[in-house]
Each structure stands twice: as structure tokens, then as C-alpha cells.
Amino acid sequence: MIIDTTEVQAINSFSRSESSKEFYGLIWLLVPIFTPVSGILIGVLVIVWLEREISAGIQQRIGPEYAGPLGILQALADGTKLLFKEDLLPSRGDIRLFSVGPSIAVISILLSYSVIPFGYRLIIADISIGVFLWIAISSIAPIGLLMSGYGSNNKYSFSGGLRAAAQSISYEIPLTPCVLSISLRLSNSSSTVDIVEAQSKYGFCGWNLWRQPIGFIVFLISSLAECERLPFDLPEAEEELVAGYQTEYSGIKSGLFYVASYLNLLVSSLFVTVLYLGGWNLSIPYISIPELFGINKTGGVFGSTIGILITLAKAYLFLFVPITTRWTLPRMRMDQLLNLGWKFLLPIALGNLLLTTSSQLLSF
């Protein structure tokens, strides 16, 4: 039997080309998945570094300076330390709830990034109910915290989980009318892309911040409470509950709560940017990014990069508010926190929604 070497070489080259196609196809499948996740995690590292540097400046002390230039890798070093720590489990707790709770908290917050536009059409899911999908998804996170508190079989953890659930319900409700005021009157849409586009004509003069100042204040307070930042960190009050629902956690599970806290803070800042600060627009009246740089509105690498930079710049500038608030205001009592949400913010938010809808009816 005579073997044709030409045919063998052709078969080998064909198999190699098919293998390379499968390999590159797998890479292109994973790139859209890992790119947003990597960007989000880098954003969290920047937030941690900013908070430590700003906190050090407020307290007149030296912040992190040894891990990398200016201590920017300190958060990465802390995460690596938690990754290699022993993962302890409570002997009398519910192990399934104890293990699933942190994952639910992180996943629900990560899903919120799918409706955040970083540029023109630079969004994972541009759907007509984008902002309300975010509100619905973010309400899942307290369920994970409650599961963590209950599964720990610890009175401090369970009290922290109950506080987290009560706080989330109390401040989700005032936050919703603020979003409705923008969707019904100012943009006539619940799509986050449409909301940004509605603010683009007059630059910073067209921001919803000026057209909805009452809603902005209520949204700001409610978002801080949703992030459990001081003065709203009742679920983790160290003086009362040790560490709240995190008391029994160690290792990577403790790190997941740590990451979830900063992920939620970044989500809130990005939604403030999208809803009230004009999103990716340059904020100069009558000047748009495509016209300024002579590029197509639908994007391109340069236009998308400019949009991402503007969005992140606004979000990180806004982060100074929650970071400085942490070192300025004392922690509230639980009754004060609930009274603020139900008796103060909710009536104001509903009144603002009533005024907004009334002005829309009178304009017809």
C-alpha cells in the first residue's frame, strides 16, 4: 500500500487550521465575558485605593505606600491574603445557606452592570426597562445577606441580616419614585441609553440634576443606604454586632462581601452619573463628542474610549461624596434610619413624583 505524502500533509494542515479556528473561536467567546469583569475588578481596586488615600488625608496620616507605587496594589495584596486564608464553616450552622449567601450578593450586583451604558450603544443589554431591572436585581442582594446571617447560626449575624433586609426595603421604595420621575417626564423612557441621550442637548445645563434636584437628593441618600455606607452601616455595626452578617466568615467568602460592598458603591455612582450627570456626554453645551473629534456617532475605538473615560471620571468624582461622608457623619440608630426612610424620604419622593406628573399633564 502506497501512502501519498501530499494527501497526509493536506490532512494535517486542514486539522491544524480547524484546531486553530476552534482555539481562536474560544478566545473570542471568552473575551466579551472576561473583559467587563476585569474592568469592574480594576474599578474596585481604584475605589479602595481612593478611599484609603482620601481617608488618610482627612485623618492627617500616611495612607498605604509600600504595596506598589503610592500603595495602589494594597487592595490586591489584601485580596490575595484572603484568598489563601482558611475557609472556616460554623459547626451548627446551615452550610448550604452559609456558602450560597455571599455568591448571591456578588452575582446580583454584577448583573446590575449589564444595563449601565459607558458610551453610545456601549452597553451589554440596552432594554426598555433598564433602570427598573437594576432596582429589581439589586433587591436580590439583601436575600443573600439574610441567608448568610441565618446560616451562620449566630445571633449577631442574624441580627445583621435582618437589619440589611429592613434597610434595603426601607430605601428601595423612596428610590423608585425618583427613577419614575425621570422616566415619565424627562426622558419618556426607562432605557438608560435614552435617559443619557435626553440630557445631551444642552450639556451640563441639561443634566437631570438641575431639573430634578429634590429627586437627586433623595436618590443620593437612598443609594448610600443601599450601599450600607456610613452613616447607614447598621447591618455591620462593629460596636453592636461585631461584624454583623460577616461575623462567622473568613477566607474567600469574607473577601466576597468585601468586593460586593465596593461593587455596589461603584454601581450607585455609575447610576448617579447616568441618571443625573449626563452619562458619557462631554457636558459642554451644543458640543458633542462626535462633532468635536470628527468621528462617527456610532462609535469606533476612539469614540468609545472617550465615552468610557468621561463616564468613569464623573463616577469617580462623585465617589468623593460617600467617601468623605464616612468620616464626617456619625452612625444613626436603627429607629432613626427607618424613620428617615419611611417618614421623611418616602413622602418627599412621592410628592416629587406627583409634581412631576402634574407638570406633564399641564403641559399637554
Swiss-Prot record:
- Which proteins does it associate with, and in what oligomeric form? NDH is composed of at least 16 different subunits, 5 of which are encoded in the nucleus.
The UniProt function text for this chain reads:
NDH shuttles electrons from NAD(P)H:plastoquinone, via FMN and iron-sulfur (Fe-S) centers, to quinones in the photosynthetic chain and possibly in a chloroplast respiratory chain. The immediate electron acceptor for the enzyme in this species is believed to be plastoquinone. Couples the redox reaction to proton translocation, and thus conserves the redox energy in a proton gradient.
Record keyword Ion transport present: no
A cellular component term from Gene Ontology for this protein is: chloroplast thylakoid membrane
Instruction: Kindly give the membrane topology term recorded for this protein.
Output: Multi-pass membrane protein
Gene Ontology MF, one: oxidoreductase activity, acting on NAD(P)H, quinone or similar compound as acceptor
Q: What family is this protein classified in?
A: Belongs to the complex I subunit 1 family.
Q: Which domain of life is it from?
A: Eukaryota
Q: What class of enzyme is it?
A: translocase
Catalytic activity from the UniProt record: a plastoquinone + NADH + (n+1) H(+)(in) = a plastoquinol + NAD(+) + n H(+)(out); a plastoquinone + NADPH + (n+1) H(+)(in) = a plastoquinol + NADP(+) + n H(+)(out)
Q: Where in the cell is it found?
A: Plastid, Chloroplast thylakoid membrane
Instruction: Cite the entry's keywords alphabetically.
Output: Chloroplast, Membrane, NAD, NADP, Plastid, Plastoquinone, Quinone, Thylakoid, Translocase, Transmembrane, Transmembrane helix
Identify the taxonomic lineage of the organism of origin. Answer: Eukaryota, Viridiplantae, Streptophyta, Embryophyta, Tracheophyta
Which Pfam family, any one, appears in the UniProt record? NADHdh
**Chief localization class?**
plastid
Q: Does the keyword Nuclease apply?
A: no
Report the transmembrane regions from the record. Answer: 27-47, 98-118, 127-147, 255-275, 301-321, 337-357
Q: What is its EC number?
A: 7.1.1.-
The identity of this protein, by name, is NAD(P)H-quinone oxidoreductase subunit 1, chloroplastic
**Record-level GO BP terms:** aerobic respiration; photosynthesis, light reaction
